């Protein structure tokens, strides 16, 4: 080291100026083929064999003077790299062949010392080169570093050390004797070498070395006492910006900014051994031995990265000559942050065995973590050991240390750091800092073979690296020749002899370990007098936390990305007292060295070839020698030319190039056994594939994904190649109501891969695509022009390219319209931000305004995007990617490219499909998520077990236990195991029991979502999800006027009046005419109180006018008597039963539907006539205006949800396309509803008198059959066996409860449609997880219903065992007069106003009978707001604030 002013005092004899020449280098596929180090000027540190740079004759050591006619002789390192990186074609450079190919140090901050006089030159400002520094920093951040061009090279780097061997003398032992302090050069004199006087001055000016020279005798003790050695990854170093000495928080934020910066740049870490000695921290590689050392007195503190706990930083301070902390003129401290990471993926012993062999040590079992001490699972043990070394540095550092420990989670998101040094030196400091800086060396391997014939000076200036475990070691390793080890001070002198020939630009400061030996603190006080040691073995706050086991912000945490790996939990290291004293000691006795060995002997020992570069076998014959090599320290020759960046080349070819294709990766990846150390002798460049980036762990896979989100913005084609990209793009399209585009494209892409000779498969797939996307009655039609429309006859001769034109149209539509909007969407922005910050990609369900809209009805990746695309016709739910019979090889070949075809459906086989067995064909696995297309067929949402689909998501996954995290109401959270075959309710019941929570009075939500989950789903779909459990209020409500009781579950925060009003309105009552009180009390209840006050209570509603209630009850009792005759007359399906129950409105609807009466089945007409007779006898015809008003209400509400693909949301603007319009015969009944309504009821609608008819004999009304809310399961028939819907089994009493009044066909149609819509809408975009899709679902839920005399157990589920949700096709069970409704069956009673009741308690023209019958026995209406209103509700759905939801 030298000061800026020292250069003027020394003679600098040297040869003539180096030869300057101009070269032109063409850019190859992997770049130009060279790496740089140093600055002012930059020097080539490595030239790859066979690269363009090698072809034009560039050699390591050449200086770059100009780039593309821009003088860069005085430019900084990063500016030169930026200039070269911007050049895309031929690179014009002017290079100077320095004497002996001299190479500069690679630190960014050093001035130029390569001109003849060696004066310190000012750095060339970036503006002179036309580079904006801010712009450069931003680009580096965005691109993840400025060396992308370097990483694209798949081959190994190889320096040109062989030609250099011809020019340089081979160093023999006889030649080594000429290396004396008085000699100025070796073979080629170096003009920048230090003189003998300067060496002496430098040594004596350094407080550390002066200690060693003044007190030789005190350092005869063993200096290699090692606390612990751990394998960590080194990312790089950044010099911290100067901060005011009284701003502790600013300093801490700057350090965290450094860690964030290096982490965001995605620099590939280099594995090093971090040896935490008793007085310093050493870094060693598997090739070069000790490459850096951080003395304890320079360790300011260490901190963990707040964003990613795997990363941690060591902060080193600079000290002045007197031992005090170095401060600049303004009083700011000069510090550097060195960033490391602990790779939890290496925790497993089997995984890191190869690394341990490479580093030459044996793993030490750690009983505390059941792992190996050298491979920690987190950064916590490393930081705990390092904290032991802290010295007292004054109040500032102590304050920063305290903040780092106690305030570690405080996020300092601003990045205050300067640009990182691009060549990632372990130290990055100013030239004039002399020996105060940390050693800067290469982390790569040696440039020459370490053998007897190797040259000791391959690449003058320290190109030759000392191999790990080479015989020349300190006083703790036996000398291979039997000579006594060196004394510490002699080692220091020997080291400076060597440094003399390294050149002044080489930053040299390796205080030998012997200078800080295991001297007790008492003796150290005399030994190190004046050196400012004042060692405090444990700072107060560190000691306190160590004793208490408190880890503050570095508490135990999980480092793995999935968050559930149990082995990754950080644990405290064992206390120092429990670690055996000899656990890390080198075995064997250590001879005391002679105190006065001649200097010439030191030199011979230091530089003799046999001593320096002796073969490894000479020192690894015994176990003791192996341990010596493991912890052998050496003096660490500096290798400035080999330092390039933090992305280091190690022994094995393991680096993945991010931009390389999968095929290239397969061919480029080299396994552990394929390369030997000899093959990698010249591998010192980051161009190679060699690193630990793809150690046998999932880390390699993670790196492949690191830039995947950014790659989506490269092109639309690139997006479609990434299954994850397709998934998020599908989510975006679903929000845009155009998901059918990507589904159609995927279907066509899959169709294109069907073999042309497989006519049967082609025909099947072609018809499926045509019927689903292209025909006039398509369920999910795509928007293509008329020229691309296909006629039915083309399906007779299908061929793989038949949909090419249509696919291209949709592709262009997505590419030029949807894709650009996707890149601007909050969903993509959130993804790219998560990738930059190293987080897992967000759940699109939780991204504001970007998740798959709650209006969408399907699951994650192939759902039916809007209600209008549903179909009510009986149709197979076949998906695009179900099994292809025996063509397993075909499936593997095709499925590799498309996320939606990777997981096969577990549907029936092709043979069963052909026989028409479509019951289970509605499962469509797409991108690992499920889609159901019940669409009116017998296949229902509930009849399919989600676990089937989930089992196909990752067939190659191991069977490891899966977990989810549930946040409980008390603020705690717990991890719950999920398993296929067990429903969510099953796993939730056990959790609720353990925590004393009534499972029936709780709802489960996704974190960030507001829809409760459907609890009968398979629990395996909750893997790695964050959920929250919310309590609900359960109470019983007795409706005395109608002799009914209901069990209700309500949101605790709702007022009593808001909960009760919609309930009583549902039963045709008016809350204002009722007296509300608790059972057993006479005082009226406060309707403004929160409903939580009624938890577990029994609330009674009585008529203020008893006579009115009696009359209403008498009317109801008279209804079923007439109905029984009609019900028992013949077997009826759901539609017939519904019509029998619609008395009030049937007559009015009849007039509207007169035109189409003749189209109905004759049998239906007879039924309708019988129903009409009953209606005429019992009721008068209601006002047509009211019916029209109700139709208008339904129409408006539904049109709000029938958002077509053009995005029209209002009925006035909605023009239905042809495929949604009904035939003219049923136009009077037409509602602007989706195709589900049009097609589901066009066959069944009452065109003659407006009433529903029974389905055709072959049709089954599945939604009602599977619903326990079916009329057949009304009170009195709740336990009837399954049969044709609506029939009353022979011998069983007909429904005779007071709620079995006939019902309007309109409400019936709405209810039937609601069943279809509900099933579709429950599958919300949340990874296939079903949620109850209702806007007010969390506010009020009907738990059960029965007579007033019914026991509580039939209305409210017992707290201990939550009520089981009936399966989709299971009939309800109960007793006569009472029944239990499934928990998650939702009936939306949106916004019921408190208008005065009409005749018999009806509301606004709707009869009381229909309203009550629907509430008791009718099927639920849809959870969609558009289907919410029922006949018993007013015509203004959005004018009231009262909401309720019945289950």
UniProtKB/Swiss-Prot annotation:
GO terms for molecular function: GTPase activator activity; GTPase activity; GTPase regulator activity. One of its GO terms (cellular component) is cytosol. Residues 914-923, 1103-1117, 1151-1169 have a biased composition (Basic and acidic residues). Coiled coil: none annotated. Transmembrane segments: none annotated. It comes from Homo sapiens. Residues 451-464 have a biased composition (Gly residues). SMART domains: GoLoco, PDZ, PTB, RBD, RGS. Residues 413-425, 843-853, 1122-1136, 1244-1258, 1301-1313 have a biased composition (Polar residues). This is Regulator of G-protein signaling 12. Keywords: Cell projection, Cytoplasm, GTPase activation, Isopeptide bond, Methylation, Nucleus, Phosphoprotein, Repeat, Repressor, Signal transduction inhibitor, Synapse, Transcription, Ubl conjugation. Regulates G protein-coupled receptor signaling cascades. Inhibits signal transduction by increasing the GTPase activity of G protein alpha subunits, thereby driving them into their inactive GDP-bound form. CDD domains: PDZ_RGS12-like, PTB_RGS12, RBD1_RGS12, RGS_RGS12. Isoform 3 is brain specific. Residues 1267-1280, 1289-1298 have a biased composition (Low complexity). Residues 1-21, 410-429, 443-482, 618-652, 843-941, 1103-1169, 1240-1447 are annotated as: Disordered. InterPro entries: GoLoco_motif, PDZ, PDZ_sf, PH-like_dom_sf, PTB/PI_dom, RBD_dom, RGS, RGS10/12/14-like. Interacts with GNAI1. Interacts with GNAI2 and GNAI3; the interactions are GDP-dependent. Residues 228-340 form the PID domain. One of its GO terms (biological process) is negative regulation of signal transduction. Residues 1187-1209 form the GoLoco domain. Residues 962-1032, 1034-1104 form the RBD domain. The modification Omega-N-methylarginine is found at residues 524, 633.
